[in-house]
C-alpha cells in the first residue's frame, strides 16, 4: 500500500500503449502490490526495455497510417520515453526524433489558425499535451510553440479553467486534465515575456482546482498534478494526495470509476501524481 512521506476496462486501441506507460511510471517510483514478493530489479528493467520499444514502434506505425497529432501516440509516448531515458534505459533516438518532427510539423502547418485560437481539434487538452511532449523531446521555443501558447491563452476561462472539448474517456474526458495540461504548456513555453501574464493567470487556476469537485480518477489525478504545477500550498496538496490514496483497492491498484476494477492506466497515473506531489510511495 501507499505510505505518505508527509502528513498527509479494457481500453480500445491505445490499451497496450497505456499499459506500457503505466509500467514505465510504476517502475520509476518502485511500487508493487502489497502482498507480492519483492520484485527483481533486473526483471523489471527487462520488461521496461521491451515496453519502451513497443511504445516507440507503435508510435512509428501510427504516423505511417495517420496524418493527425494524437496525445496517445505522440505526446504520452514522448513523455514516457524521456523518463525511461533518464532512468538509464536505452531508447531509439531516431524514432524519438521522427515523432517530435511529426508533432512540430502538424501544428506548424496550422500556424495561422492556431495562433488565433482555432485549428486544434482536441482543444486546450490537445495543445497542452503537444507542448509537454515537445518539451520532453527537448524542443526549444519557436514559432510553433509560440502559436500553441497563444492558442492556450485564448482558451483560458474567467473562472481559471480550460475545458475539455471531446469526451473520450478515460484519457480525454476531464476539465481537470485540460486545465493542468494547459497551465503546464504555458509554464514550459511561455518564456520570460509571458511571466507576468502567467502570474496573473495562476491564482484563478488554483482557485478553480481547489473549489471544483473531482468525480473520477482522472479528475483527482490532474487536480493534484495541476495544483502542484500551479504552486499550491502544501496543506492543500497533502489533502488532495490523501483523497487519491484513500481510493487504493486491496489489490494495490486504482480504478477509473467507482464501479470499475483496477487497471494499469488508473494505477500508473495515480503513482505519477503522488510522485509529482512529493509523496513517498513504495
Question: How does the language model describe each region?
Answer:
Residues 5-7, 17, 77:
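Intrinsically disordered, low-complexity repeat segments enriched in small/polar residues
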